[in-house]
Structures are given as structure tokens and as C-alpha cells.
Amino acid sequence: MKQLIIGLIKLYQYSIGLLIPPSCRFYPTCSNYMREALTKHGLIKGLWLGTRRILRCHPWNPGGYDPIP
């Protein structure tokens, strides 16, 4: 299941992600953060961390460097 989600993220990055201008306020980008969190922490915790990060990525958040814990 984890590999399926990582594959879907890669599909997004190499298809839709190339068609829209970059808008992520963080480094690494939210999609890279989710991939790394899933790889490092597994399915449940990785999804939790990635979802929290995506919810923080909005115009009222200053963004910046946000490494995976």
C-alpha cells in the first residue's frame, strides 16, 4: 500500500506537477515531504505527517525549511 501511494505521488510529480507552476511554500515541497515521510516512517505515521504538512501549506503560512522529523 505504501508503494502504491508513493507511486501515485511520483505520477503526480512527473505529470500534473510539471503542468502547474510551483506554489509550495516549504522546502522540501509537500509532495517530496510526503514521499520521504512515507519512506522513513511507514504508512500510518507518514500519511499523518504528510497530511499535516499539506494542511499547513497555504498563503497565510510563511513556509520555509521544514525537514521530516
From Swiss-Prot:
Subcellular location(s) of the protein: Cell inner membrane
Family matches, as Pfam families: YidD
Top-level taxon in the UniProt lineage: Bacteria
Keywords on record: Cell inner membrane, Cell membrane, Membrane
Record's keyword annotation contains Cell cycle: no
Keyword Cell inner membrane listed: yes
Gene Ontology CC terms, in alphabetical order: plasma membrane
Membrane topology, record value: Peripheral membrane protein
Matching SMART domains: Haemolytic
InterPro entries: Membr_insert_effic_factor_YidD
Function summary: Could be involved in insertion of integral membrane proteins into the membrane.
Family the entry assigns: Belongs to the UPF0161 family.
Protein name (database record): Putative membrane protein insertion efficiency factor
Species annotation: Nitrosomonas eutropha (strain DSM 101675 / C91 / Nm57)
Species classification: Bacteria, Pseudomonadati, Pseudomonadota, Betaproteobacteria, Nitrosomonadales
